């Protein structure tokens, strides 16, 4: 027979062993996670049995509606659930504190992960930007205004833009397909992750070409300015507000002076985002993203950096969230530039 002390340690919702106070009630980890997930959804569950279902350790999964109601009756509060951004920031700060308290050294698995990412990056994206010159470039894009004699006739900038964007997305696809952990996922999840992250990875890698002094992208013999983005099409280009947001992002990221392993780990974190639409194996992908995040934290901690860079990981998390917003705005822009989406069906599919 359970003692009074044992009962006080049990989850007030299902009776399982409690791990502490979560959202204002003593609950187990299972009910804590259930409450956070369920409350975050826009549509709540409904009970087919008039709200009279048993909620116990063995029966708690049978009726989400009754389980949620019991959570609320037990005193769990919706207003105590952090937003995804606040939760990510809190985790970053907790990880930062742990990193400052103990010396961090990369494990063999983390070193192998970095080697794998760097190898795939070198094979498929290492010389990507130098190859832009192959794609029907307008003459004015040349830094010294001296087009090579073998160039094709000058074409509208929209044609060149469509070419290089399609090329970058194809290289990103090759990069991801070269990662064993990515190939191990169901093909449906691979597609969902690529649709969500391809543009973000393109911009993370493109940042290595951004020049802070001139505010241009220097890709081999070509340069790209904010004015080029505004006149992609003869009739309309990217909105100035969007371009200013994009160039501000690249300037902020470039100022952090990331090393190549940090760039590829940041790209991997963007790739393995479990909240992309259409993803089915969310727990597995969440674990992969956590693995990338922990490796990035360990790598940053192991570098001899300036004191002002002690919050580098938290800054990168903030930039990832900013890049997500840019990605959404980019898709909208692509659809509204005359003739652009029709010229690059692959990117149109990615942004749809």
From Swiss-Prot:
Subcellular location: Nucleus; Cytoplasm; Cytoplasm, Cytoskeleton
ZnF start-end (NR C4-type): 11-31, 47-71
Cellular component terms per the entry's GO annotation: chromatin; cytoplasm; cytoskeleton; cytosol; nucleoplasm; nucleus
Primary subcellular site in the record, as a coarse category: nucleus
Self-association state and partner proteins as the record states: Interacts with ECT2. Heterodimer of NR1I3 and RXR. Interacts with PSMC4. Directly interacts with DNAJC7. The DNAJC7-NR1I3 complex may also include HSP90. Interacts with CRY1. Interacts with CRY2 in a ligand-dependent manner.
UniProt remark on domains: Composed by a short N-terminal domain followed by the DNA binding, hinge, and ligand binding/dimerization domains.
Name assigned to this protein: Nuclear receptor subfamily 1 group I member 3
Gene that specifies this protein: NR1I3
